[in-house]
């Protein structure tokens, strides 16, 4: 009789205490997410549109280079009005934790992909806390998905362009 109670108690403890105790830890994403909103008519002849992130500010045309470029999104389809993204899901070049000085949406009209500054036109810039006087810094801590990195692209009122 005591053995029967013992088995019931042990079975009950095991049954009720196994609530995912050995389940894997949830995957922690490192990156950023947000929404890109396009206002106005898309320019004719655009061949590609991407979200791009640069580590250092673009103070000269020389800063627009492959070593400074730290993230490139998948292509945003022509004519899109709203593009929601998560860098973990939409990366051509994945981003790591760190501090980044320039987050923008840029377009190109050349038939082939080019890394020359003259071939890209910035149509939207990330500004922190609504301060449109300078690009916002993106700070991504390790194992953190930074949310609400939203960019407005107004084709009738484009942002200042980085140096050519």
Language-model features and meaning:
Residues 59-98:
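Tryptophan-paired
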Residues 30-38, 51:
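A short, amphipathic beta-strand motif
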Residues 109-157:
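Structured interaction patches on ligand/partner-binding surfaces of diverse proteins
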Residues 41-69:
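Short, ordered, surface-exposed loop/turn motifs in non-cytosolic proteins
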Residues 93-114:
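A short, solvent-exposed beta-strand micro-motif common in secreted/extracellular proteins
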Residues 2-9:
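Sec-dependent signal peptide recognition
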Residues 22-28:
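Membrane-proximal, proline-rich intrinsically disordered regions
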Residues 14-17:
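C-terminal motif of bacterial Sec signal peptides marking the signal peptidase cleavage site
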């Amino acid at each position: 009789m005591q053995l029967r109670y013992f088995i019931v108690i042990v079975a009950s403890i095991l049954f009720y205490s196994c609530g995912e105790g050995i389940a894997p830890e949830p995957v922690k994403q490192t990156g950023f997410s947000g929404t890109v909103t396009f206002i106005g008519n898309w320019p004719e002849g655009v061949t590609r549109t991407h979200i791009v992130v640069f580590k250092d500010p673009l103070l000269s045309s020389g800063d627009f280079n492959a070593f400074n470029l730290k993230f490139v999104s998948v292509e945003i389809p022509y004519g899109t009005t709203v593009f929601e993204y998560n860098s973990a899901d939409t990366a051509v070049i994945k981003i790591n934790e760190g501090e980044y000085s320039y987050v923008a949406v840029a377009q190109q009209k050349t038939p082939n992909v080019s890394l020359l500054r003259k071939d890209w036109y910035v149509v939207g810039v990330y500004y922190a806390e609504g301060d449109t006087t300078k690009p916002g810094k993106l700070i991504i801590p390790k194992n953190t998905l930074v949310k609400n990195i939203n960019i407005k692209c107004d084709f009738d009122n484009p942002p200042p362009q980085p140096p050519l």
